[in-house]
C-alpha cells in the first residue's frame, strides 16, 4: 500500500503499522525476585487471543541459570488460560502455519491447544536469536519467544539487533539502575513507547500516548495513531507572512479572542498584541 501511494500522480501521506514484537527485557534480579511475572505476562500475551498489536511477542531475560525456571512457569501460566477463537479462520490458519515453521527452532517450543487456537511459547539462546533474523518478526496470535541471555552483554547485543517497535518494556529492580543506564539508550532508538515495570497491551487514549515507532513498526515514527496528538496526521504546517490582521484565522489575530498561549517573538504569552 505504501508503494502504491507513492506511485500516485499526487502522493499523499500514508500511516500504517506493519509489525512489532514489543520486546520485554527482564533483568536477572527481577527474574529471580518477582514471582508474579509469569502470570502477568501470560495474561498479556494471550489477551484477545494474542491479536493485540502491542502483544509482548519477545521476552528477553537475563538469567545465569541455563535451565531457567522462568520459562517453565510462564508456560504453565499460559496453559492455565482458556482462549477464545481467533477473529477469522484465515488468521488462525496463518498462525498455525507460523507455529509449524517455528517448530524447527534450535531451541524448545511449548504448545498448548485451546479451543480453536494454540497458545505457544518458544525458548532460544541469545546467540541463536542473533544469528536468525526472522525470529524477530511478528507472529500474530497467542505466541511469544523467550530469548535467554546468560549475561548483560548478551542482552545488549539482542537489543541492538532489533528493528523498530511500537513498545519496549524494561522490568528491573532498584539495584539495576546502572544496567538500565546502558540498556535504555539502545531501547530509545528502537521503540515509540517505553514501559517500566508493566505490560504493553494497555493503550490509554490520552495526551501522553505515543502509538507508533521506527520502521517497520510504522511508516512514520513522528506520529501517533492513538491519543489527542493523532490528529496531527491530518494537518500540515501553514504560515501567513505580512497578512492583514482581519484576514488571519481568529486564533492568530492580534486580539487573541480565545486567550490561547502563543509564541510571539520567541516568548510564550496569551495576551493580545
Where is each model-derived feature located?
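NAD(P)-dependent aldehyde/semialdehyde dehydrogenase
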Residues: 39, 61-167
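Conserved NAD(P)+-binding/catalytic subdomain of aldehyde/semialdehyde dehydrogenases
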Residues: 1-64, 110
